[in-house]
Amino acid sequence: MSKVLEQVEAIVAPITDELQLELVDIVFEKEGPNWFLRIFIDKDGGVDIDECAAVSEKVSEKMDENDPITQNYFLEVSSPGAERPLKKEQDFENAVSKYVHVTSYEPIDGRKMWEGTLVSYDGTTLVITITDKTRKITCEIPKDKVAKARLAIQF
């Protein structure tokens, strides 16, 4: 995480804690000519528009006082959606028995992408059951080799 995003997280985390919401992720990215600061929040049962608006208002007030971001940007606060990213240890633990999409930095047993059920996670290794054509295969993926992981929708 960049120093600027760490400073933004230091501003946002107390606000989400106060509102009893989980801070899922913070992303600062450019789309076309515009910059966006995207804050993703959640709670059991999901968040509603009023909670997103409350976080947006409070974050906006705090950022106006001492904004670590020098350029102009749009602030967006939303739910992470059905395919929420898995980043923190707790995210992986909560995803056990759920359908996930995982990519790795380098091939593991000839693969860089897996989509299947996360069978277990012990803090260092993800165990995923995938379907390859008609057979089920269990794959072990070291956590330190994971580039991205998210919940996925199974069709």
Swiss-Prot record:
UniProt keyword Disulfide bond, yes or no: no
CDD domains according to UniProt: YlxS_C (cd01734)
Keyword annotations: Cytoplasm, Ribosome biogenesis
Compartments, as annotated in UniProt: Cytoplasm
A Pfam cross-reference name: RimP_N
GO biological process terms on file: ribosomal small subunit assembly; translation
InterPro entries per the UniProt record, alphabetical: Ribosome_maturation_RimP, RimP_C, RimP_C_sf, RimP_N, RimP_N_sf
Magnesium recorded as keyword: no
Main location as per UniProt: cytoplasm
One Gene Ontology CC term in the entry: cytosol
Highest rank taxon of the organism: Bacteria
Homology family: Belongs to the RimP family.
PANTHER family, per the entry: RIBOSOME MATURATION FACTOR RIMP (PTHR33867:SF1)
Described purpose of this protein according to its UniProt entry: Required for maturation of 30S ribosomal subunits.
The protein, known as: Ribosome maturation factor RimP
Source organism of the structure: Listeria monocytogenes serotype 4a (strain HCC23)
Taxonomic lineage: Bacteria, Bacillati, Bacillota, Bacilli, Bacillales
